[in-house]
Amino acid sequence: MAEGEDGTWWRSWLQQSYSSVRDKSAEALEFMKRDLTEFTRVVQHDTACTIAATASVVKDKLVVEGSSGTTDKVKKGLSNFLGVISDTFAPSPDKTIDCDVITLMATPSGTTELYDSTKARLYSLQSDPATYCNEPDGSPAEFDAWLAYWDPEHRKAEISELLVTSPSIRALYTKMVPAAVSHSEFWQRYFYKVHQLEQEEARRDALKQRADQSVHSEEPQWEEEEEDFVGAASAPNFKLEEKYVISPPTIPTLHVEDKSEKMAELNRDHTSITSPSESSESISPITQIANPEYIEQTATKESSPRPLTVKEKNGAGTDESSAHAPVEQITGKSNAQIGTHREDPPSDLRVFELNSDSGKSTPSNNGQKGSSTDVSEDWEKDFDMTEEEVQMALSRVEVSGEVDDEDWENWE
């Protein structure tokens, strides 16, 4: 009993499973058949529409003259094929390509004309549905101000011409009015877009004219600036030539007014008085230059010693007599001697040249040649003078007759 019941249960389960699988498979098969049928119908419909559209385009665009023969048939088939390709890839007549390289563009009427950026933007604006559906760009206040002067009665003729000549405007007007927008809104938005386009073109033209005027106005200014620069550059050359004319050299006159230099001269005279032998052979450069005869005498004195002359003896005698003279008279005479040397500018110039020469040899106190001494020692030797040497030098000048008595009286 139990085994029979188990067998019937398994049999019934298998039958139920088989029936459920069969039902599900039938349903899936029905779905597949229905999908395939629908897909086939859609493909057939699309193919038929494409063939019909291609045939209509070829019929409208290509006109083949009636002829006979195989060549004409080949030409006809080739022209049909090329017409389909051109219609597939070419834009519609109311569309334009805004590109500066293209020199021809299609008009809404189906013809071509020379490319113009303004007209190209206008044709693109006419074929754009956003021109009529969306609100105008810019501030609403400007749009309201423009609407205050908007009068549709004055635009009736222009509206009629646009509907006749522009297929894109006519198609959009048919679709949108009155389903999407009203008649007044359609034309208000269109003409306001045209107004904005005209304003933009006017601004571009003004900027272009301003740029051209600036270029034309700057060119002559550059030429004038170049001429001014050339003139300004040439004028200083003549001034420089006149300015830097070399003048003949002039020997400046040196005026010794410093008290230190006066004291140096006094000290030099004092040293010549204390040592007569030294002053006789090594006299200051001023005395050597002022007395050219003495230069010739010193040349002979250096070669051989000489005895004292009568003038020198007289000078020694006068030194003893004049030793008791007041100091003021001595200083006055020394100043007079300095004044006589000041009146001779060339001698002063030579004195400075001789004193500045530091490397030359000067005769020593004993009359020997070739003993080089330092500049500082020479100055000390010149400054180391006593009153006797000063009196000796003054008496020598009086005997030689270089200074007149009238000059001495004037100096005193």
Curated annotation (Swiss-Prot):
Biased composition (Polar residues): 355-374
Low complexity composition-biased segments: 272-287
Database matches in PROSITE patterns: BSD
Biased composition (Basic and acidic residues): 208-219, 255-271, 340-351
Stretch list, region Disordered: 208-228, 255-383
Domain spans labelled BSD: 146-198
Name listed for the protein in its UniProt record: BSD domain-containing protein 1
Annotated organism of origin: Xenopus tropicalis
Gene giving rise to this polypeptide: bsdc1
